[in-house]
Amino acid sequence: MHANVYIPEEFLTHIESIMPSHLDMASFVASCQKPLRKSIRVNTLKISVEDFLVRAKEKGWELEPVPWCETGFWITADESEAPLGNTAEHMSGLFYIQEASSMMPPSALFQGEADYQAVLDTAAAPGSKTTQIAALMNNRGVLVANEYAASRVKVLHANIERCGVRNAALSNFDGRVFGGWLPEQFDAVLLDAPCSGEGTIRKDADAMKNWTYQSVVDIADTQKDLIESAFHALKPNGVLVYSTCTLSTEENQQVCHHLKETFGDAVEFESLESLFDNAKATTTEEGFLHIFPQVYDSEGFFVARIRKLASVTPPEVKKRLGKFPFEKASKKAQQEVAEQLLGALDIELPSDTQVWIRDKDVWLFPEALEPMIGEFRFSRMGIKIAETHKKGYRWQHQVATTLATGNEANIVDLSIEDAREWFMGRDVRPEGLSGEGEVLVKYNGAIIGLGKWVGNRVKNGLPRELVRDKNLF
């Protein structure tokens, strides 16, 4: 597949100068010319690994565990009839197609830690690591998912929506703003930094077309600014994971050492040599993971885990925020929403959430977001659960996909034919059934959306960004 991969001589000379002595250039080049193995991560917000393995076996998928992620697997599957992304399991949010190496930074962030209340993902799109973090948080606390490129926020939101994430707040800023705007607000920060992408050759034969050593030096300056900002945003005793999909020490070890030189004893490097079996094979003397592609048959990657041992003085910023357009619901109003939701769909509001109102829209925010409200501008927070109208509430899609358990009384089960129609955005007519009002829609054990009975027809409530129109399961 990638035998014709472009690898500049200058790049090979550079890699040879930084490659550990026990590795060789011939195996590096050979691995760069091999296509990546396809990998997926089970989304435990929707299904347990055990139940997913049963499904995979039924479908004839062969899975091999990814050693650094309990929910990750390399997959061999027949995609001749429908690609993995168009299977019902994928569209239902049961799994995420994610490169195995990219599962490592969230695993490192949560190593030995279970109870983060506020987490920042500084460069979040398209959402593989964000949704992995949300699953590790079990949808509790608040997860701020930031993406600098406005064009990528839409796909980030679509993936968060598909995977049933309800504790996220999305923002669209340069990651360098967080240290000044939200100093010492987060228990954990993931900085998967923009980089020269030297480790991505195996999935992009032209990844090195524009590579120069000067571009490495230039982007390292940006990375140093980003890691300082991320460190400022971290609470004392909080954990920062810095990662890249590149190999140059200028963008990796040197960026981490810059942080240590800047903040001294407040910075502690924590070793990742026990993160998984054979992690020692890529562990540096500082305890970082510097992964060349031939070692684990993966992308090239770098991961560092850093603890903040003491408070540091944040940069001063002048904030100019407009009026916050939401109003927190009164206890009485929140209780009314909860009662109506329980009556209509047999769904309970989680105890760690708050109802907020914007005009006629009803939103559910993570309770842990409240300290940041008024301090920062988010592009989207929590989930929209309803629109108010004369007769009460019109419930929204994410109520079904993020709050329903699948054991509710008000459910319609679809056949495979009707499920295909549903994912194509069409209304369905379940055989021999009729009803009234809103109804949870289920296929093969998974809640896939919210519909409304109109006689014997269920009106489709699938958001446009989740509709697929061809080549389905």
From Swiss-Prot:
Its EC number is 2.1.1.178. Gene3D superfamilies: 3.10.450.720, Vaccinia Virus protein VP39. InterPro entries: Methyltr_RsmF_N, MeTrfase_RsmB-F_NOP2_cat, MeTrfase_RsmB-F_NOP2_dom, Nol1_Nop2_Fmu_2, Nop2p, RCMT, rRNA_ssu_MeTfrase_F, RsmB/NOL1/NOP2-like_CS. It catalyses: cytidine(1407) in 16S rRNA + S-adenosyl-L-methionine = 5-methylcytidine(1407) in 16S rRNA + S-adenosyl-L-homocysteine + H(+). S-adenosyl-L-methionine binds at residues 123-129, 147, 174, 192. GO terms for molecular function: RNA binding; rRNA (cytosine-C5-)-methyltransferase activity. One of its GO terms (cellular component) is cytoplasm. It comes from the Bacteria. The keyword Acetylation does not apply. Keywords: Cytoplasm, Methyltransferase, RNA-binding, rRNA processing, S-adenosyl-L-methionine, Transferase. The keyword Transcription does not apply. Belongs to the class I-like SAM-binding methyltransferase superfamily. RsmB/NOP family. NCBIfam families: nop2p, PRK11933.1. This is Ribosomal RNA small subunit methyltransferase F. It comes from Vibrio atlanticus (strain LGP32) (Vibrio splendidus (strain Mel32)). The lineage of its organism: Bacteria, Pseudomonadati, Pseudomonadota, Gammaproteobacteria, Vibrionales. The gene is rsmF.
